[in-house]
């Protein structure tokens, strides 16, 4: 009886430790449901129904492995990816890495900020500029939580992730997708046309985000409590749960677009405004409002995450620190310039995804090299199977993004 109590007590303590260590992956997972994903998934679902759902499944599995490697690097070495690159690469290479990472962080933030502004415009009936002002105020308020430490921010970001997931459960109820066709689309690969290949590349490009690769290693490098193996075990659970939620949201986005648009003949729906306006008569005003609210939640949370990622790359690569509010102010400026110039916001979203594709391999290659180094990683070094899988992902992601870039350049 005494032994049972001791085991029960130790089991509760282990669960408590694991729970305390969870949270960083929920911040990273927000990068996988930003407005760029909304635009790409809606276009894919409207154009090809359920046929590209399998791409979301595989992209999410790849993203899970990448985020586990990023988190593991921080746990094993106590340094984030940007700091490891700074320590191991020549100075000119480090400066190149910093410049491209900053450009990518700003391009990401541009898409996320404008996405949230579009959401405010749709649900409140304000102008895009007024939506941008509301987005700026809201992100400043969320970033103020950072003063209280990482945990409060994790809770708010995690709450927004769960809100978006709940919103898409509601959208699925409204749209009532064909479950048999949905299941088939998730497991049977299909690329019926060259446009489908291009959209599949876009889905993958919008899913794997370089800025959260840098960020996740930073969020785990200062984790305390439990042994190193316990921290790694908790992190695997953290990533599995958070990325499963993000994967569900992406699947639900595409499935809703398929059920609501593709099978009603609206196969040309390609932007967020059009999706909102088309949802109202097809499903209901409530469905359109839920869509708008989910876009706001995803945009706000992902633009906060983008700001944090920008801070990490600056501190990691060049050891320079600026206050978060200064960075937030500077990175908002391109969004306001785009809006004031009257540029097409959906086109800007697509262009930002193309810019992101340049940074994916630049983040993935050193991540795989460092996490495969036994001197750096010790007992957390990558296994042979993980190394092989990792390099296959790198080759696949690079190939698909080259296809995406060429296709975009040719105007496909």
Curated annotation (Swiss-Prot):
Keywords: Cell inner membrane, Cell membrane, Ion transport, Membrane, Symport, Transmembrane, Transmembrane helix, Transport. It is found in: Cell inner membrane. This is Divalent metal cation transporter MntH. It comes from Escherichia coli O9:H4 (strain HS). It holds the Pfam family Nramp. One of its GO terms (biological process) is iron ion transmembrane transport. Belongs to the NRAMP family. It is a multi-pass membrane protein. It comes from the Bacteria. GO terms for cellular component: plasma membrane. The chain crosses the membrane at residues 20-39, 52-71, 96-118, 126-145, 156-175, 197-220, 239-258, 277-297, 328-344, 351-370, 388-406. Residues 40-51, 119-125, 176-196, 259-276, 345-350, 407-412 are periplasmic. Residues 1-19, 72-95, 146-155, 221-238, 298-327, 371-387 are cytoplasmic. InterPro entries: NRAMP_fam (IPR001046). H(+)-stimulated, divalent metal cation uptake system. GO terms for molecular function: cadmium ion transmembrane transporter activity; manganese ion transmembrane transporter activity; metal ion binding; symporter activity.
């Amino acid at each position: 009886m005494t032994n049972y109590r001791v085991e029960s007590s130790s089991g509760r303590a282990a669960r408590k430790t694991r729970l305390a260590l969870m949270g960083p992956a929920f911040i990273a997972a927000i990068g996988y449901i930003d407005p760029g994903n909304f635009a790409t998934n809606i276009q894919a679902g409207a154009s090809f129904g359920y046929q590209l759902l399998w791409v979301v499944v595989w992209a999410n599995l790849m993203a899970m492995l990448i985020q586990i490697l990023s988190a593991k690097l921080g746990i094993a070495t106590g340094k984030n990816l940007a700091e490891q690159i700074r320590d191991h690469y020549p100075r000119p290479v480090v400066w190149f890495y910093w410049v491209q990472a900053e450009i990518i962080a700003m391009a990401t933030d541009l898409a996320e900020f404008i996405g949230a502004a579009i959401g405010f415009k749709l649900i409140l009936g304000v102008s895009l500029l007024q939506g941008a002002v509301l987005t700026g105020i809201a992100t400043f308020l969320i970033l103020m939580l950072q003063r209280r430490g990482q945990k409060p921010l994790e809770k708010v970001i995690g709450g927004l992730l769960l809100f978006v997931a709940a919103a898409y459960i509601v959208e699925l109820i409204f749209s009532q997708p064909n479950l048999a066709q949905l299941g088939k689309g998730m497991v049977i690969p299909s690329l019926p046309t060259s446009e489908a290949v291009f959209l599949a590349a876009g889905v993958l490009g919008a899913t794997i985000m370089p800025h959260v690769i840098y960020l996740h290693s930073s969020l785990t490098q200062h984790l305390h409590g439990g042994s190193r193996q316990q921290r790694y075990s908790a992190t695997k659970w953290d990533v599995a749960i958070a990325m499963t939620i993000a994967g569900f949201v992406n699947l639900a986005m595409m499935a809703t677009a398929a059920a609501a648009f593709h099978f009603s003949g609206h196969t040309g729906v390609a932007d967020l405004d059009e999706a909102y306006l088309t949802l109202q008569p097809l499903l209901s005003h409530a469905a359109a409002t839920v869509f708008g609210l989910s876009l706001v939640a995803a945009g706000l949370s992902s633009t906060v995450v983008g700001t944090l990622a920008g801070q990490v790359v600056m501190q990691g690569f060049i050891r320079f620190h600026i206050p978060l509010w200064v960075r937030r102010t500077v990175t908002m400026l391109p969004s306001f310039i785009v809006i004031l110039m009257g540029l097409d916001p959906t086109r800007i979203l697509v262009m930002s995804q193309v810019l992101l594709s340049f940074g994916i391999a630049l983040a993935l290659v050193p991540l795989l090299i460092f996490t495969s180094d036994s001197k750096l990683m010790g007992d957390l070094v990558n296994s042979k199977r993980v190394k092989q899988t990792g390099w296959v992902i790198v080759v696949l992601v690079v190939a698909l993004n080259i296809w995406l870039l060429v296709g975009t350049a040719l105007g496909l």
